[in-house]
């Protein structure tokens, strides 16, 4: 009896501490719950250094709502994980939250039942300052090289960890940006090499959401840069938007555009529901791979790929994404229940958006007429691009050859001469108009023109013959003129 009375004050004190902690909405990190192991290694973060992050939404326009929603969601996860605002650099056009079509002005959601993810996100680089050049300068920590924006850069030191997340449209060897030129694989990899040579980070993890995103790293990503990369798709397939109107699950009825991207929501929803001090990068990779493949069916799904230094994936995710104390007692990573969700090819998401805008507009209204015109011009410009590339191939190689669609063996880069690729893209756009986000799918064709030794002069002649009658004036609504991609 005496022994029981002796322990009662201690139990009472513990209960008071737990009630106090719970009343604050979370448990204090210093108070270990019975289900949490007291692992000194997990508690001691002195050797981690500073966590840095670069978040890039590479698109603009309300039809691309999902990319900025993805990036804002990622920002909220990192902030909950303890990363400081001063250590997170955000590049996004910032034309969605307050867009006239946004049914909830000043907010963005990334899930049908999700909360606002826009509030508090810093406007480091917006509008015309969202450029490939600024992205490279930010990553290199070169404050003198950035133009416009907040001037914030990744001023990392040798013991620091860096997380890079990009979401947008892409194509073979290229990642889109709202202001051209785009991010080309060779330039991106060269930037990573420079960052490594500067000795200003310990390790880096990169997540890329884009069509053909594997082609950015295939055959050219070194393994000795202390960088681990995963991509939403391999080098020759699309990635997918999700949480789209008319699909399951569907966004709230007032939304006419997709809220997220399949690979992106897969990693973020995984991070939010697991203790990142216990979950490894490898575990998240396999979870995201399973979900992004639509559970190994690849029916509306893509192949998540990995590149670079694979030894990094044995590390815990908190080294890059931080640790949210609210997740302290969540279970170790388990594969989610196999529940396929509706998706749309990234390149068709804008058509889906235009269709729903047309469908929901009042009959006989100016808005309905304008939307139909934009939808018509968009599809017409797509047909023009496809037909032009096909005709150029016929002129250069003959009608029976399929040279421009050839895919190289795994492990080989898209093209041997990246400057040649840029040159061929520029020639095409000068004669045939902007590739737009849809036309980036033809980058492999231009790469194969280079790989087959075609000169710039021959490409000029073929493009002139194929597009001699092209007129920009035919496209008064569709944004076919967006500057040169290269």
From Swiss-Prot:
Main location: other
CC terms in the record's Gene Ontology section: protein storage vacuole
Signal peptide span: 1-21
Disulfide bonds: 244-258, 420-450, 432-467
Record-listed E.C. numbers: 3.4.22.34
Disruption-associated phenotype: No macroscopic phenotype, probably due to functional redundancy. Slight differences in polypeptide accumulation in seeds with an increased amount of propolypeptide forms of legumin-type globulins. In plants lacking all vacuolar-processing enzyme isozymes (e.g. alpha, beta, gamma and delta) shift of storage protein accumulation from normally processed polypeptides to a finite number of prominent alternatively processed polypeptides cleaved at sites other than the conserved Asn residues targeted by VPE.
Catalytic activity entry: Hydrolysis of proteins and small molecule substrates at -Asn-|-Xaa- bonds
A GO BP annotation: proteolysis involved in protein catabolic process
Group of enzyme by EC: hydrolase
Catalytic residues (UniProt): 169, 211 (nucleophile)
Tissue expression summary: Seed specific. Also expressed in the flowers and buds.
Site (Required for post-translational maturation and enzyme activity): 258
Subcellular location: Vacuole; Protein storage vacuole
Domain of life: Eukaryota
Glycosylation sites: 309
PANTHER family: HEMOGLOBINASE FAMILY MEMBER, LEGUMAIN
Family in the record: Belongs to the peptidase C13 family.
Protein name: Vacuolar-processing enzyme beta-isozyme
Origin species: Arabidopsis thaliana
């Amino acid at each position: 009896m005496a022994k029981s009375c002796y322990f009662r004050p201690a139990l009472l004190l513990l209960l008071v501490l737990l009630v106090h902690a719970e009343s604050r909405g979370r448990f204090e990190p210093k108070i270990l719950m019975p289900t949490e192991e007291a692992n000194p290694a997990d508690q001691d973060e002195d050797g981690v250094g500073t966590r840095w992050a670069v978040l890039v939404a590479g698109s603009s326009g309300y039809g691309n709502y999902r990319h900025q929603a993805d990036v804002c969601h990622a920002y909220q996860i990192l902030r909950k994980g303890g990363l400081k605002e001063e250590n997170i650099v955000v590049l996004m056009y910032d034309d969605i939250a307050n867009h006239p079509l946004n049914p909830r002005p000043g907010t963005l959601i990334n899930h049908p039942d999700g909360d606002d993810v826009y509030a508090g996100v810093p406007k480091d680089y917006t509008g015309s300052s969202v450029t490939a050049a600024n992205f490279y300068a930010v990553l290199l920590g070169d404050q003198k090289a950035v133009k416009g924006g907040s001037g914030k850069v990744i001023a990392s030191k040798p013991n620091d960890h860096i997380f890079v997340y990009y979401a947008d449209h892409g194509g073979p060897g290229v990642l889109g940006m709202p202001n051209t030129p785009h991010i080309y694989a060779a330039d991106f990899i060269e930037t990573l090499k420079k960052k490594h040579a500067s000795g200003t980070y310990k390790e880096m993890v990169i997540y890329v959401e884009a069509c053909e995103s594997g082609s950015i790293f295939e055959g050219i990503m070194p393994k000795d840069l202390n960088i681990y990369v995963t991509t939403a798709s391999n080098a020759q397939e699309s990635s997918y938007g999700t949480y789209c109107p008319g699909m399951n699950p569907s966004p709230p009825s007032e939304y006419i555009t997709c809220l997220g991207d399949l690979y992106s929501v897969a990693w973020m929803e995984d991070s939010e529901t697991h203790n990142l001090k216990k979950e490894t990068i490898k575990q998240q990779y396999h979870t995201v791979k399973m979900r992004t493949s639509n559970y190994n069916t690849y029916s509306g799904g893509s192949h998540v790929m990995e590149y670079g230094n694979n030894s990094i994936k044995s590390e815990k995710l908190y080294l890059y994404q931080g640790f949210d104390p609210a997740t302290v007692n969540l279970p170790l990573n388990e594969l989610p229940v196999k529940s396929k969700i509706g998706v749309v090819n990234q390149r068709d998401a804008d058509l889906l958006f235009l269709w729903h805008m047309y469908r929901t507009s009042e009959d006989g209204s100016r808005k309905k007429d304008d939307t139909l015109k934009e939808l018509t011009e968009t599809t017409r410009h797509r047909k023009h691009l496809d037909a032009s590339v096909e005709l150029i191939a016929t002129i250069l190689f003959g009608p029976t050859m399929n040279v421009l669609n050839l895919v190289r063996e795994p492990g080989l880069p898209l093209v041997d001469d990246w400057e040649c690729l840029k040159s061929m893209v520029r020639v095409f756009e000068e004669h045939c108009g902007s590739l737009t986000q849809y036309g980036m799918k033809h980058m492999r064709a231009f790469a194969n023109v280079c790989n087959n030794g075609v000169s710039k002069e021959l490409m000029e002649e073929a493009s002139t013959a194929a597009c001699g009658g092209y007129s920009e004036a035919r496209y008064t609504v569709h944004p076919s003129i967006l500057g040169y991609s290269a």
